[in-house]
């Protein structure tokens, strides 16, 4: 267990005696790795994180952080972890420095170390120049970096992040992740994060687990999981999804492995052995059938394809994204 940062065994969480948020979740996270929990809204991602950070008790099963049981050794667990929730966790009518000062006192940072620790995390998160400004004047990315800075005050061994970049624009997301990967590489910090951003998980996570309806769907490295889907992808944007799927399924000679659809966007993804050979045949067949092809492209399998293969659905939280953006904007304005 010395090299294991987080371990769960048959973890179950039931709310109100009826809703099973987690259903037998077993995972292992190695020390020093960046580990992602991927899944749609309601998959159990936040429930799992709240159990691991000692905020919730599991209904059954066991969970360990750095070898400590999260239920019986909760005080010890909290000494070694930093946690950044999805919800707003700083005060907008205070300065960045004042926020960190409050958190340092809450966390019990020794008085003679407080100023040094605050200045250290401000420097690391590139917030020193803005430390005296009210947080309401910060951009969304700056606020998120400040929230991460609060979690770093205790010099944690594991950093838990619930949707660390939700609602941020691409540039702000990249800046946040530049800081997180630096923490991982320079300090050996274990990072455990929840996300539904496929690109984020593919780019930064060493390994991931996909949750759906409270269950582990699959676990592994992103490249390994994408290889498990196999083949190549022909992606078509069409005016008639139903007819396209019907025609494609009749093309037995193309080595078709799977067909996935996104009705909302009129997209059909055909997984085949050889996309370059299959594409012209598919286009000709569909045009002969009267299907209008708006766009066609070739790609490798993505984590979306992995999720479709193992969970039979897709990860989409656009409504939740807008909700979070609006809520954080309202709170920021006070």
What does each model-found stretch correspond to?
Residues 62, 134, 233, 260, ...:
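Residues at or immediately flanking beta-strands
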């Amino acid at each position: 267990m010395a090299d294991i940062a987080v371990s769960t065994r048959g973890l179950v969480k039931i709310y109100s005696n009826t809703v099973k948020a987690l259903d037998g979740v077993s995972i292992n996270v190695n020390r020093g790795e960046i580990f992602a929990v991927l899944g749609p809204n309601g998959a159990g991602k936040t429930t799992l994180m709240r159990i691991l950070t000692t905020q919730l008790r599991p209904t059954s099963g066991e969970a360990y952080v750095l070898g400590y049981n999260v239920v019986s050794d909760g005080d010890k667990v909290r000494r070694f972890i930093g946690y950044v929730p999805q919800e707003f966790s700083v005060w907008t009518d205070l300065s960045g420095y004042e926020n960190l000062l409050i958190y340092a006192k809450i966390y019990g940072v020794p008085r003679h170390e407080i100023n040094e620790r605050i200045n250290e995390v401000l420097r690391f998160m590139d917030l020193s120049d803005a430390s005296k400004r009210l947080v309401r004047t910060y951009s969304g990315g700056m606020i998120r970096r400040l929230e991460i800075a609060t979690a770093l005050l205790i010099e944690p061994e594991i950093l838990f992040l619930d949707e660390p970049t939700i609602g941020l624009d691409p540039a702000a997301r990249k800046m946040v992740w530049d800081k997180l990967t630096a923490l991982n590489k320079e300090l050996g910090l274990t990072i455990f994060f929840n996300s539904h951003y496929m690109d984020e998980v593919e780019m930064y996570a060493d390994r991931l687990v996909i949750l759906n309806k409270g269950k582990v769907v699959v676990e592994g490295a992103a490249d390994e999981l994408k290889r498990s889907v196999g083949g190549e992808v022909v992606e078509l944007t069409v005016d008639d999804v139903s007819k396209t799927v019907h025609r494609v399924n009749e093309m037995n000679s193309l080595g078709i492995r799977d067909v996935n659809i996104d009705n909302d966007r009129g997209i059909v993804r055909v997984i085949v052995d050889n996309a370059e050979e299959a594409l012209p045949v598919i286009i000709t067949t569909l045009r002969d059938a009267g299907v209008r092809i708006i766009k066609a492209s070739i790609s490798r399998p993505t984590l979306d394809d992995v999720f479709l293969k193992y969970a039979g659905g897709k990860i989409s939280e656009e409504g939740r994204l807008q909700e979070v953006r609006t809520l954080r904007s309202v709170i920021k304005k006070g």
